Regions:
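Short coil/loop residues immediately preceding or within conserved phosphate-binding loops
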Residues: 36, 59, 144
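A contiguous binding-surface segment within folded domains or other stable secondary-structure elements
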Residues: 60, 65-69, 249-257
């Protein structure tokens, strides 16, 4: 077999990236919008014959030229990406793949977490990673009616607080999951701290980190789904496949979501959730948004006000716990990040 080389491809290398895009296109996929490492495999004439990428702790965008399939090249590309991740300190890895490719990745030491029928499989490189996460959750399982809320809280607003209060009042135990991944302007440690402070007076709320198993729409891989509607649908169905297993571990029979009049993406997501959850015996409860100044309270409005320093409006949008934090010296690095972010609406 010929000797091929694998090397990193930088964003400035437009010629190689164009070859990669052509190769991905031949496989019916496209370059994902979220990538922080791209590699290519080259033949003796420096033609791209294979590619793969990383984002955070995930592996993405694999393809091998049809002229070279059967040579074990994808195995070499995956091995290279795993070495890159190990060098970064990422030992727990995840990937999303088409259902037909899942056996191949299974042979490379990846295990299924959940799948969306005929669409995609979510996998990790730990045999018992998700199982251990579920067993850890089970320690907080309670009798009586249990419900769930999943929120990014970027940051925690009076709207979030209202949603938690409504859900907590309707059940014996409310399991509140804060999305752990750091794809938001407000870091996870701060988001979790503000949620914890904002719900401290609700004794039946149990706070959980989502871990790597519940991800945001911002980082969901879209490269093998044909359009935005398919991406939203795929993400929602995968999230629900994961959540259904979490619900079984915690005896959850209802999931609460905030109404999304302004966001088409989240609105469609909620619609799919309300269609699918009852099939798993889980009620989907959509709570109308709390309003301030005649408008639904939104975290994006809060980020805009933090960016512009509009503290008068912030007093009508944030609970005292969040307001006190943002007025403290501790918040200065986060505020600086928000001020320098440009468009903060969809962050």
């Amino acid at each position: 077999m010929s000797e091929y080389t694998i090397s990193q491809v930088y964003p400035t290398d437009k010629t190689v990236l164009a070859q990669i895009d052509t190769l991905l296109g031949q496989e019916g996929i496209r370059r994902d919008g979220n990538l922080d490492y791209i590699c290519a495999m080259f033949d003796e004439e420096y033609n791209v014959i294979g590619t793969g990428s990383c984002f955070g702790n995930t592996l993405r965008c694999f393809a091998v030229s049809s002229a070279h399939q059967g040579e074990g090249l994808l195995n070499q590309i995956i091995t290279h990406l795993i070495e890159v991740q190990c060098a970064r300190g990422n030992m727990h890895l995840f990937l999303y793949t088409k259902v037909k490719s899942s056996k191949f990745f299974g042979d490379l030491g990846f295990y299924e977490i959940a799948q969306v029928e005929d669409t995609l499989v979510f996998m990790e490189n730990r045999r018992d990673g998700f199982g251990a996460y579920l067993r850890d959750l089970e320690k907080t399982r309670t009798e009586g009616k249990s419900a769930a809320l999943v929120m990014n809280a970027n940051p925690f607003t009076l709207g979030h607080q209202y949603l938690v209060e409504k859900a907590a009042a309707a059940c014996d135990t409310l399991h509140l999951f804060v999305v752990s991944e750091d794809a938001s302007l407000v870091p996870f440690t701060v988001r979790r701290k503000l949620v914890e402070a904002g719900v401290a007076d609700l004794p039946n709320v149990v706070l959980h980190d989502s871990g790597p198993y519940i991800i945001s729409n911002a980082t969901f891989p879209s490269y093998f789904l044909k359009d935005e509607a398919a991406v939203i649908d795929g993400h929602a169905r995968l999230d629900l496949a994961v959540f259904t297993k979490i619900a079984a571990a915690l005896n959850i029979t209802a999931r609460y979501v905030g109404e999304e009049p302004a966001s088409q993406v989240t609105g469609l997501y909620n619609q799919i959730m309300c269609e699918q959850l009852p099939k798993a015996g889980i009620e989907c409860v959509v709570v109308p948004r709390k309003e301030a100044n005649g408008k639904a309270i939104s975290a994006s409005t809060v980020r805009q006000c933090l960016q512009s320093g509009d503290w008068d409006t912030l007093e009508t949008l944030l609970p005292k716990t969040s307001l006190d934090y943002f007025r403290s010296p501790e918040a200065e690095p986060v505020l600086a990040r928000i001020r320098n972010a440009g468009n903060v609406v969809h962050y």
